[in-house]
Amino acid sequence: MAKKGGWAAFPHDNAAFVYDGAALKKNWARLHKGDAEPFPSGDSAKAIEQAWRLYHAGDFEGAYEAGIKAGLDGYNVANKAACIYNNYLETSDANKQTAYAAVAARCEELQAAQQKNANAYYLAAYALGRYGQLIGVAKALAQGIGGKVSKALETALKLEPKHADAHIAFGTFNAEVIEKVGSMIGKMTYGVSKEAAVENYDKALKLNPESAVARTEMADGLYKLFGDKKMKDVEALYAEAAAFEPKDAMECLDVAAAKAEME
């Protein structure tokens, strides 16, 4: 896999993911059905549009750099590019931890400046959640990361109730905490439940029915919560995810991951 500036190149054909000119706005609603990100506006709109074009085409490093260069308004695209790249393409756990910590720090800065920016909270939760998975859920909970993730997701959903990706993340948060500490302690200490996990996954699928990652995350969550009793549902969700036609680089990575899991 070729490297550019330390970031691995996108490993798939991206010809179908190029949204030049007006194509970006025309396809925006479909491309952002998961994160409910508004189309760029303001003085830096053109630069941020270009950053999103790079992101959707799989140039995560280019998108990150362009987003950072655009200032606070570009932080969402920069942070999402960093999150997706590190989740799927970065191979070093140490690099991942550093990147997720940096995303969380930028999100705090953005939250202070733009208190109604839902993705400033969602991406903080995503980064902290992935960071917690890397260091271990038990250790993350002991460090108070669980509470930060929960609060960030609650805020994101309060600001944008139709944020499908935040519902996915909340479902996974509930499932992982219960898997680690059990239903009773999970509910008493962190306010999580199996019912809340399933409810959030279901909401995500209703809001974004063409989402592959909603299905794979739900499949993983169901297995964490119910084990082999839900294996038929788990397998069906993975099969559905693997059959999707991706519309951008992130979705391509989601579908590829689903296919790999089924092999």
Can you say where each PLM-predicted feature lies in the sequence?
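N-terminal alpha-helical interaction modules that lie
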Residues: 1-141, 146-160, 228-263
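Alpha-helical adaptor scaffolds
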Residues: 155, 159-209
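Glycine/small-residue-rich hydrophobic helix-like segments
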Residues: 199, 203-238
